C-alpha cells in the first residue's frame, strides 16, 4: 500500500474491541492493522506530547495516534523550545533513515573517499541522470573538502530499464570506480553480471521516499533531494556532523 503521507489516516475504524484500559501498543496495532494488514509498523512509543503515541513505519515514516488507536494525526509534530519551533517528526524520521543507510556494508556501495574523510554522504544515483553526472564531476572537489561520497543504485525507470542494466554492470565491474566514471561521462561500460545489491538498494530508496536522483542522504539521515554545488553540499554535509 502506498502511504504517501498516509491517506488512510482519515478512514479510521471506530469499532476496535481494544480499549484504553488495555495495552496502548496492542490497541494501536489492532486498529491500524484493521485498515491495512500489511502496514509495516516497526515501533510504537509515547511521543513528547501527552496522550499521543508515535508509530514508526518501515522507512522511518512517523504517524501519531491516540492511545486507543481511534484517532490518527498525519503530518509534523513541533515542539517550541527557547522560542523556536523544533520539528520532532523530521528529527525522528532522519534518525531512522540514518540507521538504515549507515548500516549498508561498504562493499555494497561504490565509494569515492578522501584520505581523511570528515563526513560522508550517501547518494542514490542513476547513470543516465544529467544532474547525477554533474554531481559526479564534482566528486573530486567534495573529496578535497573532506566529504566521502558513497553511491547506492536507484534506476529511476525501474529494475527492467537500460539504466538498471548499466548500474548492474558498474557494480559488477572489477574496477567499480572506473566503471562509474565511465558511466557518468556517457562512455560505454563493459556488460557484466554478478550477485549485486542494485534491486535491494532500489527498494530501500523507494521505502525511504526517494523519487528522483540524485537523492543525497547526510550522515544524520537528513535527505537532500536533487543536485547541490560541491561547496554548498560540503558545507551542509559537514554541518550535519554537529
Question: Where would I find each of the regions flagged by the language model?
Answer:
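N-terminal signal peptide c-region/cleavage motif recognized by signal peptidases
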Residues: 15-19
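Short active-site neighborhood of thiol/selenol oxidoreductases, capturing the structured segment around
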Residues: 112-133, 148-149
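Extracytoplasmic c-type cytochrome modules immediately beyond a signal peptide or single-pass transmembrane anchor
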Residues: 24-111
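Residue-level recognition of beta-strand->loop/alpha-helix junctions
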Residues: 153-155
Amino acid at each position: 500500500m502506498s502511504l504517501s503521507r498516509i491517506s488512510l489516516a482519515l478512514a479510521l475504524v471506530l469499532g476496535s474491541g481494544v480499549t484504553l484500559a488495555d495495552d496502548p501498543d496492542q490497541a494501536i496495532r489492532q486498529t491500524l492493522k484493521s485498515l491495512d494488514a500489511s502496514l509495516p509498523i516497526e515501533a510504537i512509543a509515547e511521543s513528547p506530547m501527552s496522550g499521543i503515541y508515535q508509530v514508526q513505519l518501515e522507512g522511518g515514516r512517523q504517524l501519531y495516534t491516540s492511545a486507543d488507536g481511534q484517532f490518527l494525526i498525519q503530518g509534523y509534530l513541533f515542539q517550541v523550545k527557547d522560542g523556536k519551533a523544533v520539528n520532532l517528526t523530521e528529527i525522528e524520521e532522519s534518525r531512522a533513515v540514518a540507521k538504515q543507510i549507515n548500516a549498508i556494508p561498504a562493499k555494497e556501495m561504490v565509494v569515492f573517499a578522501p584520505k581523511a574523510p570528515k563526513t560522508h554522504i550517501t547518494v542514490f544515483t542513476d547513470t543516465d541522470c544529467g544532474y547525477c553526472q554533474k554531481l559526479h564531476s564534482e566528486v573530486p572537489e567534495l573529496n578535497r573538502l573532506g566529504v566521502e561520497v558513497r553511491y547506492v543504485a536507484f534506476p529511476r525507470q525501474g529494475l527492467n530499464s537500460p539504466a538498471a542494466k548499466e548500474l548492474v554492470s558498474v557494480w559488477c565491474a572489477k574496477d567499480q570506480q572506473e566503471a562509474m566514471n565511465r558511466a557518468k561521462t556517457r562512455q560505454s561500460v563493459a556488460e557484466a553480471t554478478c550477485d549485486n545489491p542494485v534491486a535491494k538498494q532500489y527498494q530501500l530508496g523507494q521505502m525511504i521516499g526517494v523519487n528522483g536522483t540524485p537523492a543525497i542522504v547526510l550522515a544524520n539521515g537528513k535527505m537532500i533531494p536533487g543536485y547541490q554545488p560541491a561547496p554548498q553540499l560540503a558545507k551542509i554535509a559537514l554541518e550535519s556532523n554537529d
